[in-house]
């Protein structure tokens, strides 16, 4: 989901909004979803008229009162605001979804509880990972399903990804691991078990005349990724 914060012309914003709604509807239709009435978008800044009587490919009726667990505004205003927009967009597609502000630790308890692994529909959380990309294995290998106590909360299960992940863990060289990591990313890019929203900007300050890092362009910053990378930072004489 992307949110257009600035637009130059009303007609451009209208076309963008309508186009996104129509694209979402076409994805549902192509996947075999049906509806008594597919609704319409009026083509202005108002909300779409959502579909009614929507059903899945096998006639499944979507659950009612689905919740998006997301941190409240007191913890993270960005994630809270995104959850409100996303819930509204999903409702415009004919699904009964509401954003529910929830404490961070409460969300963790809900979605990572093996006994409750199928008892929720949506959640939003932020996280950080280290430089070595083995987190992709922890998050998405089928053996790490949260129903078994792991971190794979979506229940993602793709044998092709599992095979590449196994090879990644067995890699003997950095170059081999990089190639396999890129393959994992390519598969995840297509399957999208997570929808990544944004990475907040990080401001880090260091003495460039005294120290030199082998790299500085890293998500979440050097402090989060490697605690400042003391093993590889060089001092200048």
Segments from the language model and where they lie:
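Positively charged, low-complexity/disordered segments
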Residues: 1-9
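Disulfide-bonded cysteine motifs in exported proteins
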Residues: 6, 48-51, 69-70, 142, ...
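Detector for C-terminal structural segments
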Residues: 8, 13, 21-26, 77-88, ...
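Ligand/substrate-recognition segments at binding pockets and active sites
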Residues: 13-21, 31-129, 153, 202
């Amino acid at each position: 989901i992307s949110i257009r914060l600035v637009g130059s012309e009303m007609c451009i914003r209208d076309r963008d909004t309508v186009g996104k709604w129509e694209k979402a509807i076409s994805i549902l239709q192509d996947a075999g979803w049906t509806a008594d009435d597919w609704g319409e978008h009026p083509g202005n800044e108002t909300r779409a008229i959502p579909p009614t009587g929507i059903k899945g490919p096998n006639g499944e009726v979507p659950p009612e009162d689905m919740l998006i667990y997301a941190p409240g505004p007191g913890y993270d205003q960005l994630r809270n605001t995104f959850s409100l927009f996303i819930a509204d967009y999903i409702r415009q597609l004919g699904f009964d979804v509401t954003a529910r502000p929830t404490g961070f630790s409460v969300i963790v308890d809900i979605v990572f509880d093996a006994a409750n692994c199928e008892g929720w529909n949506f959640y939003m959380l932020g996280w950080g990972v280290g430089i070595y990309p083995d987190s992709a294995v922890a998050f998405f290998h089928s053996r790490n399903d949260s129903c078994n106590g792991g971190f794979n909360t979506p229940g993602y299960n793709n044998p092709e990804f599992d095979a590449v992940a196994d090879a990644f863990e067995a890699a003997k060289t950095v170059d081999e691991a990089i190639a396999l990591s890129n393959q994992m990313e390519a598969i995840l890019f297509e399957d999208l078990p997570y929808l990544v929203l944004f990475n907040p900007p990080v401001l880090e300050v260091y003495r460039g005349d005294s120290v030199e890092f082998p790299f500085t362009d890293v998500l979440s910053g050097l402090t989060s990724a490697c605690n400042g990378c003391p093993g590889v930072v060089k001092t200048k004489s």
